[in-house]
């Protein structure tokens, strides 16, 4: 592990293999020892765990995961990292590197085939330019017990946000509907090569067995949520009327009042249970 956290050794490693960082891929490699240790510990990784890692970089987190997990499958887009990873992960029989785009993977099939017989989970230092689509895909796959990942701190705060805060939005509610998110710890810029211009944070998303509340039509619920936050400075009546397009302003107004809310309320102050109530009321219109 020392060679993966020594900056001079890392630079020599990358130079030896002719590697050059790609700005378009958002490459910021993890190069400190304590972060992989805390991620592995926080995720509860043990010999029963089958871990999907996304963007292994030079293998700093991969190496630590392999010491605890039953198996680690790491998906890397940049094929120029192949000789680097071959060197840094040499001899780790429980690690498999797949080269390809994580957003083009059939995640359910990958988990079923590569992590069979193990508890599937995700641990990763996510490329910041694809954080939201990757998390969306992982959550929708609905086959991972937990997702423990490093993201920009502002994204972590948005995911964990409460109703009425500036960070609260449609993505917060999507993640919180499917998982129980927890912001674990911050990671400073000097833990990466090259150093990003933002603070990072590690979050854990624990898959829910059941949604936080009952709703008649989940698709309609998220149409309502997207409409409410698509024009978040408008009143909920106006935002839903414009955003849904299938209900009159008076129908929307009646539903909101029937749920016990004031006519001029905004969606940004509503909890998920309250969005469920409005969604269910709209079904009868």
Predicted regions and their residues:
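Short amphipathic alpha-helix in the helical subdomain of ABC transporter nucleotide-binding domains
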Residues: 249-252
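Catalytic cores of RNA-modifying enzymes
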Residues: 1-227, 254-257, 268, 277, ...
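Primarily EF-hand calcium-binding motifs
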Residues: 261-262
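Short helix-coil junctions and helix-kink-helix linkers
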Residues: 241-246
């Amino acid at each position: 592990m020392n060679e993966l956290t020594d900056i001079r050794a890392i630079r020599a490693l990358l130079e030896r293999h002719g590697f050059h960082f790609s700005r378009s891929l958002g490459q910021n490699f993890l190069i400190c020892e304590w972060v992989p240790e805390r991620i592995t510990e926080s995720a509860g990784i043990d010999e029963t765990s089958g871990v999907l890692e996304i963007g292994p970089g030079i293998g700093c987190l991969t190496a630590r995961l392999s010491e605890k997990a039953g198996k680690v499958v790491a998906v890397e887009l940049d094929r120029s990292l192949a000789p680097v990873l071959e060197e840094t992960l040499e001899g780790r029989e429980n690690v498999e590197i797949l080269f390809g785009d994580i957003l083009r993977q059939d995640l359910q099939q990958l988990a079923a085939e590569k992590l069979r017989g193990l508890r599937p989970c995700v641990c990763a230092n996510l490329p910041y330019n694809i954080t939201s689509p990757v998390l969306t895909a992982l959550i929708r796959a609905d086959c991972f017990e937990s997702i423990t990942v490093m993201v920009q701190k502002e994204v972590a705060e948005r995911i964990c946000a409460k109703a009425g805060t500036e960070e609260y939005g449609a993505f917060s509610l999507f993640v919180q509907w499917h998982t129980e998110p927890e912001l674990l710890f911050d990671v400073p810029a000097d833990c990466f090569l090259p150093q990003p211009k933002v603070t990072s944070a590690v979050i854990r998303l624990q898959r829910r067995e059941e949604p936080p509340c009952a709703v008649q039509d989940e698709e309609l619920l998220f149409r309502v949520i997207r409409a409410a936050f698509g024009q978040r400075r408008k009143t909920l009546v106006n935002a839903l009327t414009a955003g849904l397009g299938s209900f009159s302003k008076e129908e929307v107004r009646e539903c909101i009042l029937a749920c016990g809310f004031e006519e001029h309320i905004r969606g940004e102050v509503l909890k998920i249970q309250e969005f469920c109530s409005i969604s269910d009321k709209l079904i009868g219109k």
